[in-house]
């Protein structure tokens, strides 16, 4: 099924689902498959929310036991402004909470 994600920000919980429809569609480009994959994943939707609302740091917890995919890790730093940080948390196959950061280096 689709990856689900929950953002906790300012006492609000926002639920996201991977797919074409969502905040990440601002980056959707049919000619760039790697960008599209990142734009349609929950991490891409979260990154788009950060950009649209000028949120410099945010945490999303996802239900994918493998963590963020390679395309998200490669494509999203260019789409987040310099210094923005998206923390991605997940539970791995051993039940351990893991976390990685997607750090913005865009303009």
Please identify what each model-predicted range represents:
Residues 1-107:
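Catalytic toxin/effector domains delivered as secreted proteins or via bacterial secretion systems
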